[in-house]
Swiss-Prot record:
Its main location: nucleus. InterPro entries: KRAB (IPR001909), KRAB_dom_sf (IPR036051), Znf_C2H2_sf (IPR036236), Znf_C2H2_type (IPR013087). It is found in: Nucleus. GO terms for cellular component: nucleus. The gene is ZNF136. A zinc finger (C2H2-type) spans 140-162, 168-190, 196-218, 224-246, 252-274, 280-302, 308-330, 336-358, 364-386, 392-414, 420-442, 448-470, 476-498, 504-526. PROSITE patterns: KRAB, ZINC_FINGER_C2H2_1, ZINC_FINGER_C2H2_2. Seems ubiquitous. Seen in the heart, brain, placenta, lung, liver, skeletal muscle, kidney and pancreas. This is Zinc finger protein 136. GO terms for molecular function: DNA-binding transcription factor activity, RNA polymerase II-specific; RNA polymerase II cis-regulatory region sequence-specific DNA binding; zinc ion binding. Belongs to the krueppel C2H2-type zinc-finger protein family. It comes from Homo sapiens (Human). Residues 4-90 form the KRAB domain. The modification Phosphoserine is found at residue 191. May be involved in transcriptional regulation as a weak repressor when alone, or a potent one when fused with a heterologous protein containing a KRAB B-domain.
Length: 540
């Protein structure tokens, strides 16, 4: 039995015949041709074997229509959004010399050149005439929803929702893409070819668009402005992402939490939060990440690379958001203002954590003991008590830390370094947080006020401990005697009554104490002036 070719089952019309058909007849024709193509594809016919171009070249028939109908139509045949082009076929031939027009076999449309025809066939059949042979054929499992799109790129991106597949596999890393252009662009990332180099920081890029966006991080240029609120951005992607805040809508929506996204890549990265997938692994330490940008930022902790430098003080940073946040120290900008107490913050994350001091929200819970926390750093710090491990470990005393900044501060307790000096009294501190709390002793600032009794406090821990007086809460319970305490510091002091631990030793006389306050009181007895309080009564 001879094999069936497309020419054997094709039904064609002249331009005049096509014009006489009513919409329902045209729709019927399209449906029949669509089904024919799919049937041929399902039995393994390769489009390049059909010589479609030659078939139409020698027919001598007129093209069906002098206008290009929009490619993506609704199933009932109605057009959404108008027509692709108003040019007649002969005008297209004149405008593009050397390009022969090939007739489309599906919708009676005109495609410019064989490559356009191939793309057109692929859009309707799900089969790639040329490139499929190289990358391997994949079955078409689409259920068409007939949603219209203004661009081929948008259509192909949408199509993935139905198929769940992409057409091109990278042989290096296995990543898949839905267009040849995108896989070619991706392959460059493996070659290491980066011809566009930044004159300011030396960073190199594979594409001019990425290079131009990066340059704006140095110049501060933000050409893309939100029409709703006027906020400006360095690239079009950022403004689209921002617009979701106003519209509350995006083409991709998370099925788990309902969060909308403007791009497929952002959506896929977000999904990994729920699945726990972390495909990007650090070669240095083995730590895994959900997306490649996070991995690149992490790698800088190993390389020490800090490409972003402050023009005011010269301090360098590993990534751009840290620089932008630091710059606000110089400008004094604090764009995030608390509606409850009026306190302002430099960063959105610090502001969100602060808001929880008013709401009492503690969304992060320890899986080991059930204790809840208002922020992730607090929970991670707590988790070390259970695991006894952390990515950063002190070489002097072996204490583990969950993040780099507390580790750096701790190191100063051994080196004696105190880089933060009070302008009022000259007292020095190991961290910026400590000096801010200390400065309140000079300014009298007490930002934390109790709603029950109106008493105000200089810093959060004192305020939290005070609140427990009203609630009666005593979360720290001694396992030995059952006595409960409001604060962890009081609890630790109590534990020493059972263990006998006395960590504070007097160098003068060798006497030891269980708490710092008792030790400091004792040290006054060795002072040159003697104890500050002396009994004036003479013994009888």
């Amino acid at each position: 039995m001879d094999s069936v070719a497309f020419e054997d089952v094709d039904v064609n019309f002249t331009q005049e015949e096509w014009a006489l058909l009513d919409p329902s007849q045209k729709n019927l024709y399209r449906d029949v041709m669509w089904e024919t193509m799919r049937n041929l594809a399902s039995i393994g016919k390769k489009w390049k074997d059909q010589n479609i171009k030659d078939h139409y070249k020698h027919r001598g028939r007129n093209l069906r229509s002098h206008m290009l109908e929009r490619l993506y139509q609704t199933k009932d045949g109605s057009q959404r959004g108008g027509i692709f082009s108003q040019f007649a076929n002969q005008n297209l031939s004149k405008k593009i010399p050397g390009v022969k027009l090939c007739e489309s076999i599906v919708y009676g449309e005109v495609s410019m050149g064989q490559s356009s025809l191939n793309r057109h066939i692929k859009d309707h059949s799900g089969h790639e005439p040329k490139e499929y042979q190289e990358y391997g054929e994949k079955p078409d499992t689409r259920n068409q929803c007939w949603k219209p799109f203004s661009s081929h790129h948008s259509f192909r991106t949408h199509e993935i929702i139905h198929t769940g597949e992409k057409l091109y596999d990278c042989k290096e890393c296995g990543k898949t893409f839905f267009s040849l252009k995108r896989i070619r662009r991706h392959i460059i990332t493996h070659s290491g070819y980066t011809p566009y180099k930044c004159k300011v920081c030396g960073k190199a890029f594979d594409y001019p668009s990425r290079f131009r966006t990066h340059e704006r991080s140095h110049t501060g240029e933000k050409p893309y402005e939100c029409q709703e609120c006027g906020k400006a951005f360095t690239c079009i992607t950022s403004v689209r992402r921002h617009m979701i805040k106003h519209t509350g809508d995006g083409p991709y929506k998370c099925k788990v939490c309902g969060k909308p996204f403007h791009s497929l890549s952002s959506f896929q990265v977000h999904e990994r939060i729920h699945t726990g997938e972390k495909p990007f692994k650090c070669k240095q330490c083995g730590k895994a990440f959900s997306c490649s940008p996070t991995l690149r930022i992490h790698e800088r902790t190993h390389t020490g690379e800090k490409p972003y430098e402050c023009k005011q003080c010269g301090k360098a940073f590993s990534y751009l958001p840290s620089l932008r946040l630091h710059e606000r120290i110089h400008t004094g900008e604090k764009p995030f203002v608390c509606k409850q107490c009026g306190k302002a913050f430099r960063s959105a994350s610090t502001f969100q954590i602060h808001e929880r001091t008013h709401t009492g929200e503690k969304p992060y819970e320890c899986k080991e003991c059930g204790e809840a926390f208002s922020c992730i750093p607090s929970m991670r710090r707590h988790m070390i008590k259970h695991t006894g491990e952390g990515p950063y470990k002190c070489k002097v005393c072996g204490k583990p830390f969950h993040s780099l900044s507390p580790f750096r501060i701790h190191e100063r307790t051994h080196t004696g370094e105190k880089p933060y000096v009070c302008k009022h009294c000259g007292k020095a501190f190991v961290s910026s947080t400590s000096i801010r709390i200390h400065e309140r002793t000079h300014t009298g600032e007490k930002p934390y006020e109790c709603k029950q009794c109106g008493k105000a406090f200089s810093y959060l821990n004192s305020f939290r401990t005070h609140e427990m007086i009203h609630t009666g809460e005593k979360p720290f319970e001694c396992k030995r005697c059952g006595k409960a305490f409001r604060s962890s510091s009081s609890f630790r002091l109590h534990e020493r009554t059972h263990t006998g631990q006395k960590p504070y030793h007097c160098k003068e006389c060798g006497k030891a104490y269980s708490c710092r306050a008792s030790f400091q009181r004792h040290m006054l007895t060795h002072a040159e002036d003697g104890p500050p309080y002396k009994c004036m009564w003479e013994s009888l």
